[in-house]
Regions:
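Amphipathic, small/basic residue-rich leader segments at the start of a protein or domain
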Residues: 1-93, 120, 404-406, 410-426
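Glycine-rich beta->alpha junctions and the first turn(s) of the following alpha-helix
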Residues: 3-10, 14, 215-315, 425
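C-terminal helix-coil-helix/basic helical segment that borders enzyme active sites and/or dimer interfaces
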Residues: 30-40, 287-295, 311-345, 354-366
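Glycine-rich phosphate/cofactor-binding loops in nucleotide/flavin-utilizing enzymes
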Residues: 80, 361-426
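N-terminal glycine-rich flavin-associated loop
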Residues: 92-114, 140-141
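A short, Trp-centered hydrophobic/proline-enriched beta-strand micro-motif
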Residues: 126-140, 189
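A short core secondary-structure module
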Residues: 168-214
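Glycine-rich phosphate/pyrophosphate-binding beta-alpha loops
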Residues: 170-177, 262-267, 381-389
Length: 426
């Protein structure tokens, strides 16, 4: 794989269009949501922005060309995600969570399933939502745990030509939809055979919004991403056709691994976006503010060095994430390991860099009149979601290194160990 991150004409156009849309449209999200008291109200208030995003074709730009969308690869998705997330993390996360919700369908679905479930997401109208329903109350870092560990507790039982699904899920982005009755499509991780080990007993099933049985329980009032919804809900004997099984029965852990692989690299980009927004503000502040002195504070070496360190980290995190995206796009050796590194590095760097930039600005950065406090609140989530860095991501890296066949140069020219990395995690 050539080491070349030069953007082609289409990618430069995508970046330009996404940046303009974020500036013109997504910049209005904070004003529309900040004074609303509940997470549900704030989330619902983002719907017009999301509808505009869909209407202008940006959701299509996140869905692979191979299934009818306009996305040529994860690098393109990373470019789009950075431009959106830099301006507003809320609607951006709703869009990208929908993409994750579709991932098991895109990766493991049959052509007939693509034709049944994807049209609403390709139509460039409305406000379609999808959600990957994996996490459960009590945590899901050990979804593949052997007894006596509980692992996945949501069950799907086969009755004739149907699956009947029961269980509880939480922290699933936009899973209960705009009105509490469900997203347009859920891809549900569930136990289809309790009598075999998880690697053969967990599956993923597509669940269109049911007429009954999806019961909203709670909306988390989060520290950051204040206008994004991550509810807890229950599936109470929800019945779907047997043909909604995605991939092979019992192949859910591997399908989840393949679906989640790209999310790691993209969370790294989320970190880049938040750092970029913080850096741009802090740089402008340092060039314009004297803070009672006789010269702009950027003239002070401590301030200049702090800004330089921040920019170095941003560039490093972006290149690592792009490298992971390109490796995943081309199924290059070591792609999964790169994606995990991108997630861990980018997410943790965001918290550290934004905190350091707040020190450049001073105590005023602690108030919400300036953007840095809100950016830090958003950044704190990144090491925790899409596979927590401690409970899941570092454990995946640990599993790679424990394998006798592990090659530390696999990210250059070694053997891809994706199956091993996910054998005991998401």
């Amino acid at each position: 794989m050539p080491i070349d991150f030069t953007l082609n004409d289409n990618q430069r156009r995508l970046r330009r269009e996404a940046r303009q849309f974020a500036k013109d449209v997504l910049s209005g999200v904070p004003v529309a949501t900040r004074d609303l008291p509940s997470p549900i109200e704030r989330f619902v208030a983002t719907r017009p922005f999301y509808e505009r995003l869909v209407a202008e074709g940006f959701l299509r730009k996140c869905i692979p060309v191979s299934v009818g969308g306009d996305c040529a690869g994860l690098v393109d998705l990373a470019i789009l995600a950075e431009e959106f997330y830099t301006v507003d993390a809320n609607v951006s996360l709703t869009m990208l969570s929908t993409v994750l919700g579709l991932a098991p369908l895109v990766v493991g679905g049959k052509p007939e399933q693509h034709q049944r479930f994807l049209p609403p997401f390709l139509a460039a109208k409305g406000a379609p939502l999808a959600a990957f329903a994996s996490t459960e109350p009590g945590g899901s870092a050990n979804v593949g745990s052997l007894p006596p560990g509980e692992g996945v507790r949501t069950t799907a039982r086969r009755f004739g030509d149907s699956w009947v699904i029961s269980g509880r899920k939480q922290w699933i982005s936009a899973a209960t939809g705009w009105n509490g009755q469900g997203a347009d499509l859920l891809t549900v991780v569930c136990r289809t055979d309790a009598n075999v080990e998880p690697s053969r007993g967990i599956s993923i099933i597509a669940v269109p919004r049911p007429d009954s049985g999806l019961i909203f329980e709670h909306a988390f009032d989060m520290l950051g991403h204040r206008a994004h919804l991550t509810p807890r809900f229950r599936l109470d004997a929800v019945q779907v056709p047997a043909g909604n099984l995605l991939g092979q029965e019992g192949g859910g852990l591997q399908l989840a691994a393949e679906s989640f692989a790209g999310s790691g690299a993209l969370v790294g980009i989320f970190g880049v976006a938040l750092m970029r927004a913080a850096f741009q503000f802090a740089l402008s502040f340092a060039k314009s503010e004297k803070r009672g002195g006789i010269q702009q504070i950027i003239q002070h070496q401590a301030v200049g060095y702090a800004l330089a360190d921040a920019k170095t980290t941003i560039e490093a995190a972006r290149v690592l994430s792009w490298h992971a995206c390109r490796a995943l796009d081309t199924a290059a050796p070591g792609a999964l390991e790169l994606a995990i590194h991108a997630k861990v590095f980018g997410s943790e760097a965001a918290v550290r860099v934004i905190t350091n930039l707040m020190q450049v600005v001073g105590v005023d950065s602690y108030g919400h009149e300036l953007p840095l406090a809100g950016l830090l609140q958003d950044a704190v989530a990144l090491p925790l979601f899409a596979g927590g860095n401690i409970g899941v991501r570092r454990r995946q890296l640990h599993a790679l290194m424990l394998d006798p066949a592990y090659d530390d140069l696999a990210t250059l020219d070694g053997v891809c160990l994706a199956e091993t990395a996910f054998s005991n995690g998401e």
